[in-house]
Amino acid sequence: MKFMIGCNYWASNAGTEMWRNWDEDAVREDLRVLSVNGVEYMRVFPNWRDFQPVMPVYTYHVQLVKYCLEGDRAPENPEYIDETMIARFRKFCDICEEFGIKLIVGILTGWMSGRAFIPSALFGKDLYTDPTALLFEQRFIRGMVTRLRDHKAIYAWDLGNECNCLGPTASDEVATNWAITVANAIRAYDNTRPVVSGMHALAPGKDNGNWTIAGQAEACDILTTHPYPYWAKFTDRDKIGSLRTAIHATCENKLYADLGQKPCLVEETGTMGPMLCDEERSAAFMRLNLLSNFVHGAAGVMWWCANEQTNLMSDPYTRQMVELELGMRREDGSPKPVLTETGRIASVIRSLEGRIPAAEEDAVCILTHDQEQWGVAYMTYGLAKQAGLNIRFAWCDDELPEANVYLMPSITGCYVMPRENYLKLISRVEQGATLYVSNNNGILAQFEDLTGLRVTEACIEQEVGTLTMDGRSFCFSRERRYETVSVGATVIATDNRGLPIISEYSKGKGKVIYANFPLEAALINRSNTFDSDEYLIYKRLFRDVIEAHEVTTDAAPIGITLHRDEKGDVICAAINYTYDAVNPEFKIADGYAIGEVLYGNVDTIGAFDGVIFKLTQKA
């Protein structure tokens, strides 16, 4: 799959009203500027309100008598689709084809920028379960896909823009069934193109929401994330130029891809305008996300959005202010730095595409029940990146991937994971794997046998303390204290009471590392999250794995991935996840040397930038 580079598009002259206020000249100029600056893919939106303007007609006692089109027009076709809108959309596709732009079409665009755009016939209805709503959705899909499926500019069909914002759902079964129904309706009329999710804010498991990663993966061919630091949960604590913000999109996208076992596209991202950061940082933010997601195997990155919307006088632009200044182009049409930088990095990625194998992974991070799954995943990923450990994610209910190292960070509550998977995990430890567990008021069966520790007392207590490990002190916090003594475990660190807080226990051919505090969960709501040195705990606990890498660094902002081909040749990608230039001072394993530099500078990695180079084996 080609790495998708582009943006989300509404016309500069009209925004969400572009199909009603169609201006071919404005659209053509928009696309010309975008295409010459590296935009190869665009996500576009046939406004549902405009393309299927079906309205109800009532008679005596407000009884429904028939449906027609807005303005009391007779329907032009069985799908109640406005053929004028279809003609405009087809012309739009023609222009995109002229400029070499491929389209992801968000079919059921009933939600956009804080406003619902649905046909009046469906007002007040449950769009996921109501028979009338489902009927008109099926008709709309049939009408759109059959009329446009022959156009070469269309790359994929998207269920619609963030359709999980169209109303509440009673259960995950409702959400998943709706997504499968819509996706299969699309495939019924066009099975030659991928179906893209278009959703955001999905949950790893049912206990954190009805719209789940697994549900979308069951329905769609390509999953999507919309990782905005301003909007996403727990992502707005630090500056745009911070490591916490920088890893967000890569982490979330990898979480969805790993749990869903489907390609995942960063379908929308951006810095949300000049009140959050300046234009130079926005450009650097896009550069970083293109490079980082490319080397981590994402399906692509798309900016929100193409154009400024400060001159638009229609809702939602007149009702809220955050959507107005997000474009890659200014109001006068000139490119912002984010657009020109997108074009530059697009050229770099196209030169590397097909030459860089998948990144190697060191460990599996298992997310468990009852915890704040996204927050824990996010913080674990950040600590691991700083330490030099590359992780993938797994959900505790699913089949656990084979691995040499497992992490169960910040377990919470008493339902942690199904017993059958727990026993499989213990068996893998006995066969030689390493298991790391940190505790956030969680209960583990067979705790003593697993950890070599015995709990003597436990109590709820808001505790902030200091632990000592290898002569270095670290702050910790926890809400429940399990007081333990070793019954076979080696104590690596003690708390300020002198009690074991990090330990290691040999179990069969493997080992269990236990942290008696929620290292990861404690960081979720903390500002300047990764400016302190907690990552050194990971670096110490997993040092055998990390030090076995051909390339390492002590520079915490630098995340390294290694990419090995079938012949054993290695490419190293090093990304700087901060807005300060960093000297990585790479440590190269014996027998290797830095070879051809494919991108960047090995001596200094600029702000939100990277370096990619080959390793050569010494004779």
Feature-to-residue mapping (PLM):
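Glycoside hydrolase catalytic-domain groove-lining segments
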Residues: 173-177, 192-199, 203-274, 308, ...
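Short, flexible/disordered intra-domain loops and linkers
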Residues: 57-63, 168-173, 205-208, 232-244, ...
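Conserved, mostly hydrophobic/aromatic
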Residues: 7, 34, 96, 144, ...
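Active-site mouth of glycoside hydrolases
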Residues: 1-215, 220, 284
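Short, solvent-exposed loop/turn elements at domain surfaces
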Residues: 12-19, 233-234, 372-374, 522-524
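Carbohydrate-binding surfaces of carbohydrate-active enzymes
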Residues: 258-262, 270-619
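Alpha-helical scaffolding within the catalytic cores
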Residues: 26-30, 139-145, 202-215, 246-256, ...
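Structural recognition of the beta-strand scaffold that forms the well-ordered cores
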Residues: 4-8, 41-45, 103-106, 155-159, ...
